[in-house]
Amino acid sequence: MSGVNNTSANDLSTTESNSNSVANAPSVKTEHNDSKNSLNLDATEPPIDLPQKPLSAYTTVAILCLMIAFGGFIFGWDTGTISGFVNLSDFIRRFGQKNDKGTYYLSKVRMGLIVSIFNIGCAIGGIVLSKVGDIYGRRIGLITVTAIYVVGILIQITSINKWYQYFIGRIISGLGVGGIAVLSPMLISEVAPKQIRGTLVQLYQLMCTMGIFLGYCTNYGTKNYHNATQWRVGLGLCFAWTTFMVSGMMFVPESPRYLIEVGKDEEAKRSLSKSNKVSVDDPALLAEYDTIKAGIELEKLAGNASWSELLSTKTKVFQRVLMGVMIQSLQQLTGDNYFFYYGTTIFKSVGLKDSFQTSIIIGVVNFFSSFIAVYTIERFGRRTCLLWGAASMLCCFAVFASVGVTKLWPQGSSHQDITSQGAGNCMIVFTMFFIFSFATTWAGGCYVIVSETFPLRVKSRGMAIATAANWMWGFLISFFTPFITGAINFYYGYVFLGCLVFAYFYVFFFVPETKGLTLEEVNTMWLEGVPAWKSASWVPPERRTADYDADAIDHDDRPIYKRFFSS
């Protein structure tokens, strides 16, 4: 569904054309038509292009962005290790309760709180701590939130037998990870060349899956110990990961948009030069610098950004916040955590009794599928990936839930004797298909879209609110899933199936394509009110030719059913 016009990734705005663009209009309604007309008249002067470079030329930039994306590894490591901690004997003995038989166990409530409270900390941290990146810069912000994460790990690793101490440590480490989840994709999106921006932001999700996988492997390697080594090794390694993260921040470039905002223009040019692999005096680089600076100066004229500005419909900020919240919420409601929770039960039906082996199998599929996503997000576009992902996951859930209800446990959860080995095998296959579909589309695609959507003045706030929605749904699903699955077993799958149907239609009608556009061009597209299903054919003002019909893109009077079946 991505159009050819939208993928001309090497075009840059000139200062002259930018002065006429909608991005510079305080009131979109009053200047929208005038800007379109003037832009078409001025189209005789072609924009300055950055030199076309092979992907190998961006190796250094990719490595630098990989260092920034390592924040995703920290989040993934926590996810991978905590899922195993709650099944380790020493952890249960220290932080669990005794039953009538004198054995220790973790109640569903206590286990749910220990695991899911992390998400609450992340939601708060994303909203509160992301502001550090606006004040002191993205790099300093990432170092700060990483330090807060370390404090939380210290509290957890020094816990002896008080579950609430571990609980508090989880909240504090969540604060740090919440800040990382906002600032890491934000910095990547602001330093990455637009030709490969989607791929580089996708590295954050790749590092998440790598952290989850290695966390699973660490738990598997320590499970045979009979003391605190079982879980303290996993926590102790966090100090190595955070040291690497902080060290890496010494080498990555600061966001050129932040540098321009605080008046460090020469540093901003050097940052752009480092990211785009051109000299600091290159005309195309200077043109992009002028475009960014003009947009920032315009935003400054409106005064300091406030939280209330997120409710503005005049500049389409509220619509973007709503879209970001919906996309991040729907990512959780795809049901990926449901599969991670139920995977052990299903795999047991074919003889895999070791839950740690089950986790590793799921982690392997999740991790290696993420490599494909690094390619597909830029090749096929954000919107297309989300649509295909929703459709394929929907099919997986339809088969998984139906086979579970009718063949595996036909008499319900009260009779859990496996009645069909073939049914169990079928469900495992579709579990893997689901994880593959999720990892290659929605897992990282949501972060890419959200990081590209908001104008600079409200970017940290908008991303924080959207990401907080993800964390809140993560808390609700991880806390209540054990209770829900105990009550309705595989019928729970139909709930997520319904959510995926909604997700498909929501993406089609409300999520625009941003592939191949600069962040400033994305802002212009939103201001022009381009329908999402026609966004792949939208052309930035400075690249329009005389035969470009902006009205045909901005307005579509066809019936809904005809729009839906068009590209």
Swiss-Prot record:
Keywords: Glycoprotein, Membrane, Repeat, Sugar transport, Transmembrane, Transmembrane helix, Transport. Probable glucose transporter. The chain crosses the membrane at residues 57-77, 113-133, 140-160, 171-191, 198-218, 233-253, 337-353, 360-377, 385-405, 430-450, 468-488, 490-510. GO terms for biological process: carbohydrate transport; hexose transmembrane transport. Residues 78-112, 161-170, 219-232, 354-359, 406-429, 489 are extracellular. Gene3D superfamilies: MFS general substrate transporter like domains (1.20.1250.20). One of its GO terms (molecular function) is fructose transmembrane transporter activity. The keyword Nuclease does not apply. The lineage of its organism: Eukaryota, Fungi, Dikarya, Ascomycota, Saccharomycotina. The gene is HXT9. Residues 17-28 have a biased composition (Low complexity). It is found in: Membrane. This is Hexose transporter HXT9. NCBIfam families: SP. Belongs to the major facilitator superfamily. Sugar transporter (TC 2.A.1.1) family. It comes from Saccharomyces cerevisiae (strain ATCC 204508 / S288c) (Baker's yeast). It is a multi-pass membrane protein.
